[in-house]
Amino acid sequence: MDDFIHVVEIIYKGNSCYVPELYSDVRATFNPRRNSGLAFCDTALFVAYAKGRCVGRVAGIINHRANKRWNVSCVRFGYLEFIDNFLVAEALMEAVEQWGRDNGMNMIQGPMGITDFDKEGMLVDGFEYKGSAIDIYNHPYYPTFMEAMNYRKAVDWLQMQVSVPQNIPEKYTRAARYVRERTGLHVKKMTREEMKGEYGLRVFHLLNECYGHLFGFTPFTEEQMREFIKKFIFLADPEMIPVVEDTKGNIIGVAVTMHSLTDALQRTHGRLFPLGWWHLLKALKWKRSNHVDMLLIAVRPDYQGQGVNALFFDDLISIYQKRGIKRAETGPTLEENIMALSQWKPFNPQIIKRRRCYNL
């Protein structure tokens, strides 16, 4: 397991755009006591060696719940890393392909993870931009090698960068006021205690409802929900996570945003100790980035297109302005999800990254 985790130190040495995952998180991902998703997934970890040193890795994942939901016999590959050597990449992919066949699978797809909150999608455009806490960064030769192995595009995700306006656009101020007055919808900010309790679970049930139709999605179990809440409660800033409720307290939508942890994670070098935790704490509490990651926006299907986003933007822009935030980067969004992509149009978005799920 140590070689599987630490090989990235060789592959990305000197790369200023690479953002490491915390090594403790990688270990937890493949620990059944820490990841309840392994109850319905089979996994196999493969490591490549050349001249006595580790030069690549890949994880094979068979998500039985996802396969049943989408009626496929698919093995996923994830955590794929390799040096600039085609034979290494080919050997890794052949290993996970054979493992899939040995377990009755007839297709392979990735990069994908065990859950839908794991990083997914190989970067195919935007290599000059830094990675983030929620996405994969890889070298430009990765997609070249994948295509040479006859892997083809399944779907692409896009990420955009927008500048935070100096003033809240009148369009959103007007729309937010109209929605509040005519529908009774309003913005609520969760407390940390609410996040840890039943309210936090209700937010995850909303995500299951909103994202159920998206590529490869598998609904979260309540055990997974509790694990995610426990993991991310330390990182969460309630003021930057607006929830929209109706007059009866039903959750209609949620937006999850946070100050970027990119620079702090780079300073950790993947390690919480001895000083990694301090870099993260500073980035969360005192020395916050002027760049925000907009992790997700979810609106209940029957309320989409009814001005809920105006409530989010009206609320968040004022907070961003107070905190001196200059720009925001969206999370990966399927290129076919036109409604989600179009919500950024008033902010003159710039597409900065494209990432791809391959299949064979």
Task: Show the residue positions of the predicted features.
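A conserved beta-strand-loop-helix scaffold within acyl/acetyltransferase catalytic domains
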Residues: 8-51, 56-69, 189-298
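Acyl-donor binding region in acyl/amide transferases
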Residues: 67-150, 268-346
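Short beta-strand segments
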Residues: 109, 161, 243-245, 256, ...
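Short, solvent-exposed loop/turn segments at secondary-structure junctions
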Residues: 114-116, 165-167, 193, 260-262, ...
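Acyltransferase donor/substrate-recognition loop-hinge adjacent to the catalytic core
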Residues: 136-215
